Amino acid sequence: GGNGGSATGALAAVGGAGAAGGDATSGTGGFGGAGGSARGLIFALGGAGAAGGDASTGVGGPGGPGGTGTASSPFGIAIAIGGAGAQGGAGTSGATGGAGGDGVFEGIAVLGLGFGGAAGAGGAATGDGATGGAGGFGGAGAGIANFLGFSVLHGGAGGAGGTATGTGGNGGAGGGGG
């Protein structure tokens, strides 16, 4: 799937969403597109990643990562949010979920909010000995407030591991938080 476009705004910007990967009857599902990055003075939201394609017999496509949101405000207020990662595709082996995008405010803000995007879950796997996909890693929240300022930083949640259905199957590992 195609990647979302990046965005730069005078005050606010939102990155474009990625497009989903195609499904496959056998073989490998398509990669999910990545979310576009965003840069705005006061507000920035990274685009969401898109889901990986499923494979009936084979490996699912990886979920697309979320885009980075970056805010750099001369006005002292900056809100930056990373885009969400997407779920990995299902298959005989599940694919990895997409990572969440980082939310970063730059400079020395009076009020700065940086929130990492949540990660996508690993893809489900079906069949004997199947392995679920690993969950993606959550995005980071980053920035520094000045000595009179106030900041809130929050890392994104990691993605759940993919389920496995079948004899001798193994569920996927969960992703770490941002």
Residue ranges and their predicted role:
Residues G1-G178:
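Glycine-centric low-complexity repeats
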